[in-house]
Amino acid sequence: MILIEHILGNVKKDPVWQAKLKDATFDLLVLDQREAQKSRCRKLSTQGLDLGISLDRHVVLADGDVLAWDEKTNVAVVVQINLRDVMVIDLSELKSRSPDELIKTCFELGHALGNQHWKAVTKNNEVYVPLTVATTMMDSVMRTHGFQHLPFRFVKGAEILPLLSNSEARLLFGGAEDTDTHVHVASPLDEPHGSGLHIHGIHSHGDGHSHSHDSHSHSHDSDHGHSHSHGDHDHDHKH
């Protein structure tokens, strides 16, 4: 195993390393966004080098980081980070609204995003949300909750990463792929509970276990009796 304790430079940001590695062969260490947030990990490069990453805890790997360079063979070990796409919600339009409208919209947007268990970072009048489901599903959530007046778009994660601090990058990208598939396409906040589509995926918990929810429905009548359908069994409740 080759121990990596320091980052030599960055081939995408540092002109010196760009010139030095102009004709070099890159042996890539490919990381997903969760792995990139770790200061310690062990993984093979694309050419089979066994690399042990042991960086200071405050150091976060970035796309293009040079971890090793053999001047004789002109081969460099370079980090390639595969980031998820990001939904960018532009809040600039809210500046022209009344304080009451601004507060109401921000509260309802936060509620809608939180109800999906989606991570988010707010910066520069924009909200960044990493994709954990299809863009069509995220688009549906935004429009169903009445936020079509807020411009939003989908961009590559690499476009957003330079705008973030290390802590913001960890919050936005660290473990985003572990977020539960938990999509609710429901009516706005003032609608009665139960009017809408709920799709639950697998939930992971810190205690080491996970569980899944089959598609289920809840119906509520006037005396608050309700029925549940859970996979292969049904039961009724009266209160």
Curated annotation (Swiss-Prot):
GO terms for cellular component: cytoplasm. It comes from the Bacteria. One of its GO terms (molecular function) is nickel cation binding. SUPFAM superfamilies: Urease metallochaperone UreE, N-terminal domain. Keywords: Chaperone, Cytoplasm, Nickel, Nickel insertion. The keyword RNA-binding does not apply. Residues 204-239 have a biased composition (Basic and acidic residues). It is found in: Cytoplasm. Residues 185-239 are annotated as: Disordered. Pfam families: UreE_N. The keyword Chaperone applies. Its main location: cytoplasm. SMART domains: UreE_N. GO terms for biological process: protein folding. Involved in urease metallocenter assembly. Binds nickel. Probably functions as a nickel donor during metallocenter assembly. Belongs to the UreE family. HAMAP family: UreE (MF_00822). This is Urease accessory protein UreE. It comes from Yersinia frederiksenii. The gene is ureE.
